[in-house]
């Protein structure tokens, strides 16, 4: 199961941990993925793994 939003396709990004001494080590920034149950237009419900931002967008427009 990938860490990817089913709607926006948002996935992990890579960057650096930077210490106080400016030492840099690689790290991953993971999206805030939530599993939610969504009711579709035809009345059926399905589970989606979507990011928290897309969940807010869904709540706003539905």
From Swiss-Prot:
Family to which the UniProt record says this protein belongs: Belongs to the bacterial ribosomal protein bL28 family.
Keywords associated with the record: Ribonucleoprotein, Ribosomal protein
Cellular component terms (Gene Ontology): ribonucleoprotein complex; ribosome
Protein name in the entry: Large ribosomal subunit protein bL28
GO biological process: translation
Gene Ontology molecular functions: structural constituent of ribosome
NCBIfam families (alphabetical): L28
Gene3D superfamilies in UniProt: 2.20.150.30, Ribosomal protein L28/L24
């Amino acid at each position: 199961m990938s860490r990817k939003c089913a709607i926006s396709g948002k996935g992990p990004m890579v960057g650096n941990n930077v210490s106080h001494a400016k030492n840099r080590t690689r790290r991953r920034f993971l999206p805030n993925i939530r599993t939610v149950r969504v009711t579709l237009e035809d009345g059926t419900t399905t589970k989606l793994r979507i990011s928290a931002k897309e969940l807010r967008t869904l709540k706003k427009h539905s």
